[in-house]
């Protein structure tokens, strides 16, 4: 799957969890999920579960610790889905 397609799906999955809709409108790979989009850290588990379902992958807890930006998500998902 192309990086752009993964990026678009990641943003779509994050959309309902993002409290800052203005930041969501100008999202990029460097956008911080917790700080800029204001996704509640407790909801990050739900986001990861949706990533796993959408892309047919498994994401380990250690991998989740390395996710802070949308680009981190795209890179991790691309690696796992390859």
Protein language model regions, located:
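Thiotemplate assembly-line natural product biosynthesis machinery
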Residues: 1-23
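Phosphopantetheine carrier-protein modules
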Residues: 18-38, 58-68
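Two-component histidine kinase catalytic core, primarily the HATPase_c
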Residues: 43
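Conserved alpha-helix in the HATPase_c
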Residues: 46
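C-terminal structural segments of small proteins and small subunits
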Residues: 71-80
